[in-house]
Amino acid sequence: MQKVLVTDERRMLPTYASMPAEELPMFAENRVHQRSSGNPYPCKIVAQVDRQHREERPFRVITLENEYLRLELMPELGGRIYAALDKRTGYDFFYRQHVVKPALIGLLGNWISGGVEFNWPCHHRPSTFMPVDVSIEEELSGAVTVWMSENEPLDRMKGMVGIRLAPGEARFDTRMKVYNGTPARHSFLWWENAAVPVNPQYRLVFPPDVHYVQFHYRKNVTTYPVASGVYNGIRMGDGVDISYHKNTHQPTSYFCATSKYDFFGGYD
């Protein structure tokens, strides 16, 4: 294959209805959300979910494909990677969500699981369930970058994520551009939230100099890979190897401590 193939199509997906946003403003100056104030004003909040009404709905899907990978992007759902297929093995190496089912995790309410969610200026970003702008760049080398961008609705800062796939490579790159077009100073976070399929053998891989992990806001700390004591209300006992996903029986988070290395991963 001499160049990356790009397709732009509409695809039907089972979709649960999104509830109407609250009409009254939420003044939540003390609402904590991923180390930001979490104050949604003047944006409206979706505060309920609908689990009764589901229908087939069309969504725009942009596909990038070379000899090894097929990436599916969904600009109408926050500008996310919906799925990524290893063509050699037929394996979806990100979790492919087969239904659009909003949950109340986003800063403004709606959020969906699966694929890769891109977040700015905080996590999970205000517009994670909103459409974004799209532009496609084709290089002379045959590589293609799909840029998905927006002016986020709270601070009006611009964030752009570019998904680049080149011919002959069994990998893709994400690129980012950020702009503050306002006269004010704003804090900024960039977070790429990937969902992966797991099994009893799935193992978290942190760099070799990481010996402890932290919970959100550094509220709790425990040793890694073998944890003990109490962490986020979970009794670890005399020692649990938390590098294996099967040993975590309750919802929680393990954030990698400071490291001189620039990688992490998972292996199944």
Please give the residue ranges for each predicted region:
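Core domains of carbohydrate- and sulfate-ester-processing enzymes
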Residues: 107-125, 213-230
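A short secondary-structure junction signal
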Residues: 158-162, 174-175, 187-190
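A contiguous, surface-exposed recognition patch within enzymatic or periplasmic domains that forms
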Residues: 4-5, 9-29, 62-64, 69-72, ...
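Active-site-surrounding "flap" and adjacent substrate/cofactor-binding loops of secreted or lumenal enzymes
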Residues: 88-108
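Acidic/polar residues at beta-strand termini and the immediately following turn/coil
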Residues: 74-76, 86, 119, 152, ...
